[in-house]
Amino acid sequence: MPNPKNTIRLVVVTTADDVDEEFNVNQPLQVLFNRALHEVGGEGNQDQFALEYNDVELSDLSRKIGDVAEELGWVDGTQLDLVPKPVVV
Amino acid sequence: MAWREDARTEIDGLKPHFVSKHGWSPRIVEHEGTDVLDLIVTLHSKRLGGRVLALRLRYQPDWQIAGRREAFVDPDDRSREGLEHWPPARDPNVRGVNPEHNPPCICLRGVWGYHSVLHADRPMGDTTLLGFLLELQKVLDE
């Protein structure tokens, strides 16, 4: 059944403050990623962080939030993680 | 002592979401009469077939510059340390964990091995305990 709303409330747990907001389902995941990055001050180091759901990285950030939500069964309040990627040099 | 309070503050500040998700069970061990505070963290490694590891991060007065001193210890008797408690060096190894290095160390930001041994030119800066543990958990699972 199609979601009559055009927003979904998502929570992103980060290493700083968490994000808990409504997002337009027509926006790309990049918007959610950027919002979470802002909380950790990582805007300039996108490649050092990953947006994850159930421990799986959401790597295609161009996909619409609504499409991913439908595919993965997200509902209002679904929780994701923003985690740092290991930097081994 | 400020260094000890700072250590306790960052340990107490670990986010319950991540602690619970990964089963870290952080535990502080203090040694009377010494400038040492140990944090013991339980780690479960998918990469190593579910092996349980116990990481000891030793805080000393210089930890904010030198890094948190890392060692893996016996999960059943955390007073015992030794290479046998580290992830293996190969087949499968764990990226960034170097048990064969002298001294054994971890090449991830936030610990002594990174900031004082392998990359002494790279300061601790704003590295955090939580960030380090998440990075270590990631390499233990990948």
PLM segments and residue spans:
Chain A
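Ubiquitin system architectures
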Residues: 1-89
